[in-house]
Each structure stands twice: as C-alpha cells, then as structure tokens.
From Swiss-Prot:
This is Partitioning protein REP2. It is found in: Nucleus. It comes from the Eukaryota. The plasmid 2-micron circle is a extrachromosomal element that resides in the nucleus and propagates itself stably in host cell populations. It provides no obvious advantage to the host but imposes no significant disadvantage either at its steady-state copy number of 40-60 molecules/cell. Residues 275-296 have a biased composition (Basic residues). It comes from Saccharomyces cerevisiae (strain ATCC 204508 / S288c) (Baker's yeast). GO terms for molecular function: identical protein binding. Residues 58-296 are annotated as: DNA-binding, and self-association. GO terms for cellular component: nucleus.
Amino acid sequence: MDDIETAKNLTVKARTAYSVWDVCRLFIEMIAPDVDIDIESKRKSDELLFPGYVIRPMESLTTGRPYGLDSSAEDSSVSSDSSAEVILPAAKMVKERFDSIGNGMLSSQEASQAAIDLMLQNNKLLDNRKQLYKSIAIIIGRLPEKDKKRATEMLMRKMDCTQLLVPPAPTEEDVMKLVSVVTQLLTLVPPDRQAALIGDLFIPESLKDIFNSFNELAAENRLQQKKSELEGRTEVNHANTNEEVPSRRTRSRDTNARGAYKLQNTITEGPKAVPTKKRRVATRVRGRKSRNTSRV
C-alpha cells in the first residue's frame, strides 16, 4: 500500500524522460506477474509524445536509473542545460495509462485494496499451479516407459501444452483442471504403489480435500470398470460352453430323444383321424340269390 501511495504522488524530474509505461509495468508485475505487455513498443510511442527527450526504461522507482546505466556514468548525449529538464506528472499519467487498458486500480482506496487482494489471490493460484506442475512431473517421471506415452496423450487431451512453456495468468478453473490431470495420471500407477507416490506429490493444503475426493472417485470408477470387464468375460465363457460340439454318443442320444419326442407328439397331440365310411364290397354267391321279400 505504501508503494502505491508513493507512486501516486511521484513526479519524475530528469533530463531523460523515462517512459510512464515502465511505471505501469512495475504495478502490473506486482499485481499480475503473468500478464505480458510489450513495454518496448509502448516506450517508442512515448518518444513521439516527448520529442527531443531520450526515452529509456526505468530501473526502479527509487534509483531512477535506466537499465545498464551506472550511477556514476554521464550521458553525453543529453545536455546538462537545466532547460532540458522535464517534470512528468507520473501519478496522473500512470492513471491514464491504466484507464486506457481498462484498469482503474489507482482510482480510490477501495480499488487499491482490491488490487492487493487480487495480488494475494494471484500469488496463491501461482503457488498451487507450481506445486501441481511438480506433481505431474513426478508421476510421469516414475511411470514405466510403456506408460509414459499414454500419460503424455492424457496430458495433451486435458490441457494446452504450450501453457507449460508460457503459463498464462492462473484461474481457479485451471487449477482444478490440473488436479483432475494429476488424478488421471495416477490411474496409470499400480494400486500397490499409489500410496507411496501420493506421499511424494506436492498437493497444496487447500486442495487436498478436493484431490482426495477426485482420487476416491477415480478408484471407484476403476473398480467398476474391472467389475464390468470380469462380468463380460464370464458371459463369454458361458456362451462358449453352450456352443461346444457334442460327442458321437451325445449326438446319438439326442437324436433318439428327438425322434421319441416327435413320435409322442404325433400320437398324443396330433390331429385326430376322421373316421371314413366303409365301402361295401360285393361278393359273388353261387346259385340263385334268395330274395327276402315278404308277401302279405
């Protein structure tokens, strides 16, 4: 807070007009270290605003010396004439620059306190991310060679690997994603070695409960997956048993049984035969046939 108040009341009196963007850079580095601003191009634009003055980077707010310039060295390119001196209203110009990038952190006491709170939160996220990066490196380093390729593929699916080289400003979401990555990488470690490996990891204290919950959930999913695989194998074995080719004796016995079953069905359950009318067959009788006639 003292540094902010000092900067608000600061004026730069020098023959060399230091870029106000360097003052902005000091605040940005304090509040958001990961934010990358091209100070050099901003400095060149300020050279157009202050013609006749050499714009150089400011080393610090206290020394007021450019980078690489010894305090005892004299700048021959700058005249010692007092008329060449310029007073830059740093507080006003710094505020204008901050407003131009959508930031009004120096506008009030509450905003200054909010900037400090943001700085503390940012430092906490940076520390958490750093520890989780270490944990990821430890896990991958201890995996067998055959599993390192799978671990790399998992890492590339979950996050942009360019962020490992040039990390952006951290967020809560990014940190939680890293916790998820650590949990997934642990699934590649044999269960009997997980406990010892977890003890060597750098898990932030504030995230240990979440990490343990993620790890338990991953273990449950792993057990469920193994159970499903085991049930699938059992079903396959059962199907193979039913499809075995019977022996000759079994085939003969089954054939006889099927024949008896068909015969039984034909006798008992088949359609009943409809009785047909018997045809009278004429028989020849020798001699004259008697006539059965009754006379009245």
